[in-house]
């Protein structure tokens, strides 16, 4: 039986990534024991890596929102994940591959072989994280603001904890219940926009709930991906998941007769999400895990939601009210409490 303070914290690290995208990694890959010489610089690079990853991931909602002005959600999802898959497979064929894999894996603690049953789990999680979840997210994003969408994604950690408890019987500490309550309080305000009287007639509220539904499917992917987390070649697994999702969405696009055009002016935004928000964030997060530990990365990565709201406010000129800010901070506090180990 897994223990939440250890294993589940490691799981959350990947939540967002693969949240847009990948899978979880148990805390056992955390490698904070740096040698004395250069230890400070290694930890510094670890913090720089995770902050950079949060910025890259945070801007994704804003870039998606811009693309929604000219493209269908299915089209955006298809091209985004196809490009991400190409990028990850490209990285896998470069010398950077071994550096990334060595940062992820500990000698003797990873499995080199991917079994037949693993491919079934890989297919299932690919459908959850790169087909269903992005469709819900992009459709919801079209009806709400990127500010709200970024902040609402924090409910992923709540779903991961609840699913971990229900499926794997993860143990919860007293402080975890406080964190859960804070996340729920912040989410309730953001989901309803503080107006319960018009909740059923408010299009923006519908969009908010679609974003929350996307967060659920991404969290389900994270929990189920536990069965893949000990594989050595996680770049391959991530590339397969992205590619499967992209091509499934492409098939859906063709069957439904959706416009397949990727406007030239939208190409930089699609590349930004695919290469930086998905691909580079994936690599940077694992580097950070190696240098500063999974728990610290898990506590810092939710800052991506705050960066996302700030980007939407500055670039899209979306409203960012004081109450939205307070709700976001309340949720971030809840996430931090869930990851805080008292050390």
From Swiss-Prot:
- Topology within the bilayer: Multi-pass membrane protein
Which residues belong to any copy of the EamA domain? Answer: 55-192, 216-340
Task: Kindly list the places in or outside the cell where this protein is found, as annotated in its UniProt entry.
Answer: Cell membrane
Pfam families in alphabetical order: EamA (PF00892)
Q: Where are its TM segments located? A: 13-33, 44-64, 71-91, 121-141, 148-168, 177-197, 203-223, 244-264, 269-289, 296-316, 320-340
Keyword set, alphabetical order: Cell membrane, Membrane, Repeat, Transmembrane, Transmembrane helix, Transport
Q: Where is the signal peptide?
A: none
Is Ribosomal protein among this UniProt entry's keywords?
no
**GO CC annotation, single:** plasma membrane
Q: What is its main location?
A: membrane
Hey, which family's this protein in? Belongs to the EamA transporter family.
Q: Known PANTHER family for this protein?
A: INNER MEMBRANE TRANSPORTER, S-ADENOSYLMETHIONINE_S-ADENOSYLHOMOCYSTEINE TRANSPORTER
Record-given protein name:
Uncharacterized transporter MTH_841
* Originating species: Methanothermobacter thermautotrophicus (strain ATCC 29096 / DSM 1053 / JCM 10044 / NBRC 100330 / Delta H) (Methanobacterium thermoautotrophicum)
């Amino acid at each position: 039986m897994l223990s939440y303070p250890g294993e589940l914290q490691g799981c959350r690290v990947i939540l967002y990534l693969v949240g847009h995208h990948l899978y979880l990694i148990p805390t056992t890959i955390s490698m904070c024991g740096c040698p004395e010489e250069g230890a400070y610089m290694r930890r510094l690079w670890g913090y720089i890596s995770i902050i950079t990853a949060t910025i890259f991931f945070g801007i994704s909602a804003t870039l998606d929102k811009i693309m929604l002005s000219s493209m269908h959600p299915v089209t955006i999802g298809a091209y985004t994940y196809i490009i991400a898959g190409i990028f990850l497979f490209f990285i896998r064929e470069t010398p950077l591959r071994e550096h990334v894999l060595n940062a992820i894996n500990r000698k003797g603690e990873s499995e080199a072989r991917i079994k037949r049953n693993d491919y079934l789990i890989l297919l299932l999680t690919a459908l959850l994280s790169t087909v269903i979840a992005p469709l819900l997210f992009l459709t919801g994003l079209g009806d709400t603001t990127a500010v709200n969408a970024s902040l609402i994604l924090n409910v992923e950690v709540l779903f991961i904890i609840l699913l971990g408890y229900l499926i794997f019987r993860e143990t919860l500490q007293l402080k975890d219940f406080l964190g859960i309550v804070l996340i729920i309080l912040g989410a309730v305000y953001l989901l309803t926009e503080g107006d319960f009287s018009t909740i059923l007639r408010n299009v923006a509220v519908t969009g908010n709930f679609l974003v929350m539904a996307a967060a659920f499917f991404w969290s389900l992917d994270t929990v189920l991906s536990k069965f893949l987390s000990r594989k050595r070649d996680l770049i391959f697994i991530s590339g397969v998941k992205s590619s499967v999702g992209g091509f499934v969405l492409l098939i859906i696009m063709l069957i439904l007769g959706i416009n397949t055009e990727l406007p030239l002016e939208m190409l930089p935004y699609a590349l930004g999400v695919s290469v930086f928000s998905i691909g580079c964030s994936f690599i940077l997060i694992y580097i950070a895990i190696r240098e500063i530990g999974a728990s610290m990365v898990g506590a810092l990565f939710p800052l991506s939601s705050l960066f996302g709201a700030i980007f939407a406010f500055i670039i899209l000129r979306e409203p960012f009210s004081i109450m939205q800010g307070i709700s976001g901070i309340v949720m971030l506090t809840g996430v931090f409490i869930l990851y805080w180990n008292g050390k």
